[in-house]
């Protein structure tokens, strides 16, 4: 499909510099009508100004959707049932937001009769892959326009010059841009670029926006009780909440105690290494607490199998395969495992640390104090049974040893 065949484009629009320039560029380059879509994922910024900017550039169809609850309930919570982390550290805050944006963008394209969608992801990053894999899965014949892979605007300064030359309303001025590229939603805020491109450079304390430094966190710990039903947090300190409210509250509690900061170099799907800094206070608490409630409610082999599958599941999300048959299959297995994950976890938040200090389940605990006790178990467990168990498991080792094998 050539540019002349594109009549209407649905644009994922934040109202910032990049997507505002993209909006005008689409109008000029493709001569098409543009529909804008702005998602409120709990990024903490006013999204309504995006409406005024889009209107000022002649956009007739403007969508601004509050997706905070859907994001938390249908994307973040299912991911945390799996205890998903990428490369042992990253809690996938950016990755998990992209499939929802792609889904809603395709829905809007269908509603408005758009024959193409557009996004502001660069040609170097993972987001282009995540947006487009999702879009093609949900509408195989959709045309995707990725301006960063087409135009000759290669820097923030050239974008600002373009905006000025066309009267695009942009708050930031040339030479006064933020040193970091930031992305936020209810799960996290990320920082890239600037001095972070040097993996040896320590970020300034002023970069962090959601959390106090652990050194300056309160000198007294905060205790929190989290109630779980089927693997999801449904109440904090006994107060039942929606998924979005749970995440917002845990972000507050974690941020106030210096929890959730992360500075990593990760392997992007496109092949390069990238350094990023993240604040995920609520998610950090959720991961620790969920593993704790699973520790007393999951069968050993089920728990171990989940741990084996988790890296694969996390990679699927990181690489953009949320809308795939393999992710769906894994999700069904994970969700089935959570039927018994019910109970309460008590955590202590103190100077950047999350410590589990209690866990209980009235209906589904597999922890038997009568068997596990170091005191007199009154015959609940016959220690003599261990001898046969050990000998059976040692049989292959003993046979190999008799045949001359050396394990030292």
Swiss-Prot record:
Family under the similarity heading: Belongs to the argininosuccinate synthase family. Type 1 subfamily.
Q: Which residues bind ATP?
A: 12-20, 39, 120
**Where in the cell does this protein reside?**
Cytoplasm
Q: Which GO terms describe its molecular function?
A: argininosuccinate synthase activity; ATP binding
Which top EC class applies here? ligase
Any GO BP: L-arginine biosynthetic process
List GO terms (cellular component aspect). cytoplasm
Q: Which domain of life is it from?
A: Bacteria
Per the UniProt entry, what species is this protein from, by scientific name? Methylococcus capsulatus (strain ATCC 33009 / NCIMB 11132 / Bath)
* Entry's transmembrane regions: none
> Its Enzyme Commission number?
6.3.4.5
* Full protein name: Argininosuccinate synthase
